[in-house]
Amino acid sequence: MRLHDLRPVPGSRQKPTRKGQGIGSGLGKTAGRGQKGQKARSGGGVRPGFEGGQMPLYRRLPKRGFHNKFAKEIIAINVDRLNKFEDGTVVTPELLLETGIIKKIGDGVKILGGGELKKALTVKAHAFSESAKEKITAAGGQAEVL
């Protein structure tokens, strides 16, 4: 079997409806849009959130909060994610990024104490929780703050 031999399962694909193709098609003339009105026109229709002139929900509800432009984006991961590495590995934020454990470093990486660590690793990160430090040292490794 080759790629050009592949065919869809019979009945799995329908032909697209061709609207406005004559009265006999059942979708001629107005093409399923009804008679006149805003929704019958090209480009017609109301924007998302429009409620027919009634005060829309997004304006009835109060504003809340603000965006803190000084907020630090700390990427947190649990110690059990570090079991992926071999014994004796020096785990850095760059290595975590390369292996796909984190998507970006942001303003720092913090190691949290979720799960169990079974490998003796030297972990270098910007911050550690107390339980994470204990688990890393208990497994025979070191926790170094960058």
From Swiss-Prot:
Summary of subunit composition and partner proteins: Part of the 50S ribosomal subunit.
Where do Gly residues bias regions lie?
A: 21-35, 42-52
Q: Which organism is it from?
A: Carboxydothermus hydrogenoformans (strain ATCC BAA-161 / DSM 6008 / Z-2901)
SUPFAM superfamilies reported for this sequence: Ribosomal proteins L15p and L18e
Kindly give the InterPro entries that the UniProt entry links to this protein. Answer: Ribosomal_uL15, Ribosomal_uL15/eL18, Ribosomal_uL15/eL18_sf, Ribosomal_uL15_bac-type, Ribosomal_uL15_CS
**Which terms are listed as keywords in the entry?**
Ribonucleoprotein, Ribosomal protein, RNA-binding, rRNA-binding
By what name is this protein known?
Large ribosomal subunit protein uL15
The organism's place on the tree of life at top rank: Bacteria
Q: Does the keyword Ribonucleoprotein apply?
A: yes
Q: Can you name a GO cellular component term?
A: cytosolic large ribosomal subunit
